[in-house]
Regions:
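C-terminal structural segments of small proteins and small subunits
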Residues: 44-45, 50-80
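A short, charged, amphipathic alpha-helix used as a generic interaction element across diverse proteins
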Residues: 24-44
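A short, exposed loop/beta-hairpin motif centered on an aromatic-Gly-Thr core
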Residues: 14-25
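Short aromatic-glycine-(Arg/Gly/Cys) micro-motifs in beta-strand/loop hairpins
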Residues: 1-16
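A structural detector for beta-sheet-dominated domains
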Residues: 9, 23, 69-71
Length: 80
């Protein structure tokens, strides 16, 4: 299992220092979607354009971003 890091980025930032082990990039995407959905549900003011979860791999390389927004479906911007 590889460790991925899920940072809060945008108007308010927070760096994930512990990370989370995932079996694959696909699983990391699902975990990032879960985090984004949870933040939007618990803290609706954070669900704004420009706020997202930035996912980094074990080497600190950004691999994709998941927007934090309210509503069905999620989009994803591939970085690497």
């Amino acid at each position: 299992m590889k460790r991925f890091y899920f940072d809060l980025a945008g108007a308010l930032t927070a760096c994930d220092r512990m990370g989370h082990q995932c079996a694959s990039r696909r699983e990391a995407k699902e975990h990032a979607r879960f985090i984004a959905h949870r933040i939007a549900a618990v803290r609706p003011p954070f669900a704004q354009p420009g706020n997202y979860i930035r996912v980094r791999d074990e080497n600190g390389v950004e691999i994709f971003e998941i927007p934090i927004h309210v509503g069905p479906g999620y989009s994803m911007r591939q970085v690497a």
